[in-house]
Every structure is written in structure tokens, then in C-alpha cells.
């Protein structure tokens, strides 16, 4: 199928599904109660999921964010796992998956891959809650499945998150906090970083936040890959969007002057999960990766007139600094890399969230990234230099109380634009604009049912993106980014229509 015909096909499918969603939601709106989702919390406390979520899981509203920041506690005796109101039938575990139809394509240099079919997105088994007063825990397990995804093959099991969080440690140093303030909390384990806006809580399922996962030298792709591309080696595999093992100190305090909240977090992260290529590996040896360095990530926010997701506004600053391992352990090549060979990298950014009328949320972030020259020197790149780039995204969410025309509650509409712009490549033979990214994501969700037990939503998502100059067909010298007349762009798009449910 020719590219322009394929685009018309995608658009026709999207228009048809939107019309179907509108009709179905209109018919069901008179039958379904307006109950607006880890359902385990709703079961525990006996309230509907809309107490903690905007009209649609998994995005948290102001109350839900505060509940999370306070260690999944309301501040009552009902928080305790031994409370008499919690029956033996309560199990603090939820499961979530999405079933439906997905179509995806990716093309580079006039050649590409197209997939499509019915399937599911995998399975998340989630458990969060309280072990005792001011002691929280979280576990997310993704089981290995022989037919996971939409025809993409088997998946491996992984413990995506596993942590314990100790709350209100300030009391041990003689500081008495006000009700609702949790000034000093310690989290240990593997967890999502306190990024400006949680990717795990995003309602989009098929499109990542580009700046959270961007790596200089590696062509950006989303959902599927497999086309021939050009790249250069970079030992730094750090992504702020990936869960990391470490320890985090964090706190939240009400600020009367702004009628909002001040939040902070500082995490120390181990590099044993780094998977970048290392120099010094003997031929024929499967060398170890990772390392024993400690990297840091921090985030501070101040909100005004609320938490800044449903009411009020919020501003923040965040950053990461660390050293990426670059050489194998000469004494034990199959062991983890040595700490002393690490080379520095940094990420610095700002974020903002604006709300209007309790229905609109405009939010976004900008980040500056830099990987040091010696990372690329370690890979044998001639005339290596620092790799520097800027990333950003902006998203508009609209959750109307009643959708105009159809007079139906329970809708969520989103649009997000992701952008990456490179200033300099670690390998100077690659063009400045190599791996620049423009990504557009459109989302419509209708919430069929949300209660204290189950959640189900109709989900329609479309993503289209372009990654500049990463083609390989016109490369003059193998291993370089010099093309004649130019390197081709990578073009990708994905459409997902399905039912997203949790229980």
C-alpha cells in the first residue's frame, strides 16, 4: 500500500471509531452511573475510584496525588491493614490490561514494516498500600507471557517496581509536622522517579514521552522498530522514564501563602541496570555491564491554589547528574563495570501545569541533556565531542463534565506534542539534526464503568512521529552519519482501539 493511501486508511479508521465511540457513549450514558482506579484502594476504603482519579484512570486528580505523596494514607485508622473495617475478603492486589486492535507501521529509506491485529498490551499485577502506620509499600509485577502484545511475540517476567516507603521520619529528629504534612520520607527499592508528570499514570498506552527515553546516538522509535538505521555508540543508557533501583528522600508540605503544596524529592540511583556498550571487552567474551556508580535525580515543585492537576497551578524544576560506566572490569570482564571509569552526564529541566474550570489541564516540561565527550572517546569515535540536546513536551487534557452535543459524562480527550532538538552529536560525522524528533499523540477515552470494584474504558489512541536523518541507505562511509545527498527520515505511526480495564 502506498504511504498516502495508508494514511488515508488510518484516518478513515480513526474517524469511524470516533463516531462509534460517540454513539455508544451516548447510549450507555443513560445506563451507567457516573462513578468515576487502583481498584484495590477503592475496595479498601469503600469509595468510588473518581475520588482519586480524574474522569478516567490511571491519571490521578489532586486528591489522588496527595494520597500517593502521603504514603497511600488518609490519616485515619482505616489506613491500618489490621483495621476491623477491613474484612478477610480484602486483597490489596489489582490487575490491568487492554484488549483490542492495534495497527502500527515504521518506514525508513522507502522500506518499512507494517503490523496489525487483535491482541492485548500485556498484564500488570499491582499491589500498593500500608504495612503499618506510616510504612507504605508498592509492587508492580509484569508476568512473562508467551503471546504478549499485539503479535509482537513473547515477553519476559519483570518486577517493574518493588519498594518500601517510611513516612514522617522528621519525628525522630524532634520535628512535629502539621496534619497533612509529610516532611521527611524515605523510599528504598526499585521505583519510578519523581518525573514532572508520571508516564505510568498517563492515559496514553502506545506513545512514550520522548524526552524521558531519548538517548543520543540511538534512533528514536515508538511501539515497533526493525528498519535499517544509522547510529553511533553511547555507553549512557540512563532514561529518566525508566524505573530505577535506589533510595529516595522526599516530602510534601502545605503552603498557606500560596494555598498550595511544596514538594521535593532527591533520589540516589545505582548504575547496575545500565546496559550501554563498554570498551575493553575481550573478543568472544560476554562482558558485564552496569557498574557501581551512584547517580542522582531531584525534583521540586510549588503549587498555587490547589495541587495543580485539577485545581490551581504548579511550577517545578528537576535534574539528574551522574556517571555512566564506560569500561569493562579488566580483572573480571564478566563482572559489573568498574566505577572509576564513569564519565559524567546531566539532565536539567523545568515543568509547569495549568488548570481551568476543573476540566482543562495544560502541562508540559522542557529538559536540557548533555553527555560528556569522553563517553564517546571510550567507544573509539574520532574527534568525539559532547552530545547536547533539548527535549520538551506539552499536553492538553480535557475531561468535560458533560460532553457537548451528546450530553454524556465520562469522556477524556488528550493531545500531546513531543519534540527533540539536537545541538551537537557525540560523533561529529553525524549531522546536527540527526535524531531530531517530532511526535503527535491524540487520545479519546470513554469510561463505561468505574466503581469501587472495577474499571473499564473504551480507548482510542493515534500516534504519528518523525525521526530525522537516521536512515542508512545513503551512508557514504559505514559507521558514519554522512549521507549523500541526505540521510532518510524514520516515519512511524500507531493506532490502538480497545477496552482498557482493571479490577
PLM segments and residue spans:
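N-terminal secretory signal peptides that target proteins for export/translocation
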Residues: 1-10
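C-terminal segment of classical bacterial N-terminal signal peptides
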Residues: 21-34
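Sequence/structural segment immediately N-terminal to covalent heme-attachment motifs in c-type
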Residues: 38-48
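The canonical Cys-X-X-Cys-His
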Residues: 46-56
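Outer membrane beta-barrel
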Residues: 57-61, 92-104, 111-274, 292-314, ...
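Surface-exposed strand-loop-strand hairpins of Gram-negative outer-membrane beta-barrel proteins
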Residues: 86-92, 100-121, 284-287, 330-338, ...
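Short sequence motifs at beta-strands and strand-loop junctions characteristic
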Residues: 115-119, 154-158, 238-241, 290-292, ...
Amino acid at each position: 500500500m502506498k504511504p498516502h493511501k495508508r494514511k488515508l486508511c488510518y484516518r478513515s479508521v480513526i474517524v469511524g471509531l470516533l463516531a462509534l465511540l460517540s454513539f455508544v457513549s451516548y447510549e450507555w450514558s443513560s445506563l451507567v452511573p457516573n462513578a468515576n482506579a487502583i481498584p484495590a484502594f477503592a475496595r479498601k476504603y469503600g469509595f468510588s475510584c473518581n475520588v482519586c482519579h480524574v474522569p478516567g484512570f490511571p491519571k490521578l486528580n489532586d486528591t489522588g496525588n496527595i494520597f500517593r505523596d502521603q504514603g497511600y494514607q488518609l490519616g485515619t485508622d482505616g489506613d491500618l491493614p489490621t483495621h476491623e473495617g477491613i474484612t478477610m475478603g480484602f486483597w490489596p492486589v489489582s490487575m490491568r490490561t487492554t484488549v483490542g486492535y492495534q495497527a502500527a507501521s515504521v518506514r525508513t529509506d522507502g522500506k518499512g514494516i507494517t503490523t496489525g491485529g487483535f491482541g492485548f498490551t500485556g498484564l500488570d499485577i499491582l499491589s500498593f498500600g500500608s504495612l503499618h502506620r506510616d510504612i507504605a509499600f508498592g509492587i508492580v509485577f509484569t508476568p512473562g507471557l508467551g503471546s504478549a502484545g499485539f503479535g509482537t511475540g513473547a515477553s519476559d517476567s519483570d518486577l517493574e517496581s518493588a519498594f518500601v516507603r517510611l513516612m514522617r521520619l522528621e519525628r525522630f529528629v524532634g520535628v512535629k509536622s502539621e496534619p497533612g504534612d509529610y516532611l521527611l520520607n524515605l523510599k528504598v527499592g526499585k521505583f519510578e522517579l519523581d518525573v514532572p508528570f508520571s508516564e505510568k499514570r498517563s492515559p496514553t498506552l502506545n506513545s512514550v514521552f520522548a524526552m524521558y527515553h531519548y538517548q543520543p546516538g540511538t534512533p528514536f522509535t515508538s511501539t515497533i522498530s526493525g528498519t535499517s538505521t544509522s547510529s553511533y555508540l553511547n555507553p549512557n543508557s540512563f532514561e529518566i522514564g525508566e524505573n530505577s533501583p535506589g533510595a529516595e528522600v522526599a516530602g510534601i508540605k502545605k503552603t498557606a501563602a500560596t494555598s498550595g503544596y511544596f514538594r521535593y524529592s532527591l533520589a540516589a540511583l545505582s548504575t547496575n541496570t545500565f546496559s550501554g556498550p563498554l570498551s575493553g571487552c575481550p573478543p568472544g567474551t560476554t562482558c558485564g555491564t552496569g557498574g557501581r556508580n551512584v547517580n542522582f535525580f531531584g525534583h521540586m515543585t510549588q503549587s498555587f491554589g490547589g495541587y495543580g492537576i485539577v485545581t490551581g497551578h504548579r511550577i517545578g524544576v528537576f535534574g539528574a547528574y551522574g556517571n555512566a560506566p564506560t569500561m569493562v572490569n579488566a580483572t573480571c570482564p564478566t563482572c559489573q563495570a568498574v566505577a572509576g571509569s564513569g564519565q559524567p552526564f546531566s539532565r536539567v529541566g523545568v515543568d509547569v501545569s495549568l488548570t481551568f474550570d476543573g476540566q482543562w489541564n495544560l502541562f508540559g516540561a522542557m529538559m536540557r541533556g548533555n553527555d560528556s565527550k569522553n563517553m564517546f572517546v571510550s567507544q573509539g569515535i574520532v574527534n568525539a565531542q559532547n552530545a547536547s540536546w533539548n527535549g520538551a513536551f506539552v499536553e492538553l487534557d480535557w475531561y468535560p463534565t458533560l460532553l457537548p452535543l451528546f450530553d454524556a459524562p465520562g469522556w477524556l480527550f488528550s493531545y500531546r506534542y513531543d519534540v527533540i532538538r539536537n545541538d551537537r552529536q557525540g560523533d561529529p560525522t553525524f549531522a546536527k539534526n540527526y535524531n531530531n524528533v517530532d511526535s503527535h499523540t491524540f487520545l479519546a477515552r470513554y469510561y463505561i464503568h468505574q466503581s469501587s470494584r472495577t474499571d473499564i474504558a473504551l480507548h482510542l489512541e493515534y500516534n504519528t512521529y518523525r525521526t530525522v536523518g537516521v536512515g542508512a541507505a545513503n551512508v557514504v562511509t559505514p559507521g558514519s552519519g554522512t549521507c549523500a545527498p541526505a540521510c532518510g527520515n524514520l516515519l512511524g505511526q500507531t493506532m490502538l482501539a480497545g477496552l482498557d480495564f482493571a479490577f
